[in-house]
Amino acid sequence: RSRGLGDVYKRQDYNDACSILAGKRHYYRAFKNTNRKWGVPIHVQMAVIYYESSFQNRAKTPMRYFLGIIPLGRESSAFGYAQALDGTWTDYKKATGRSIARRSSIRDSADFMGWYMTKTRKLTGVSLSDAKNQYLAYHEGQVGYLKGSYKRKQWLINKAKNVGNRSSKYKRQLSSCIRT
């Protein structure tokens, strides 16, 4: 039987796309709006956010320490659902005119990913449905992707494969609870 988003789930299960959207209805609205505006499939957006922030709106990169005790600051400026860097987020706000967009907003983060992935498609030819290669370009930047910088990073290639697999899994799951 088809499960609707209104079905009750006992707890938020981040391995189940329908559970995620049922527990956070505003996520579905954000992902759907991004899909309509930019063409990025909902399951691709969800898979990237899962690996970038585990759906935590204020996610930050880990702290770095000198001698294991003296804090040196964060690994990068990445923040929020999409783990967007300060400079890239500023570029997004300027390019889209969304000057008050916040990285801690699922709506703004999903829109950012749509904007970024659309740029990736234009610059690299990577399909918006190709979660694995979109993730590689998302992580390395479009120029880094074109140069193949990820090829020397087996851990990143493995992670991108996981993003692709999770995207496929989410796509299958979503077919039972929403019309895509």
Please state what every model-predicted region is.
Residues S2-Y9:
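Short, small-residue-biased leader/transition segments that mark boundaries at the very start
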Residues R1-S2, H26:
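Short amphipathic alpha-helix starts
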Residues R11-T180:
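Catalytic glycan-binding domains that act on GlcNAc-containing polysaccharides
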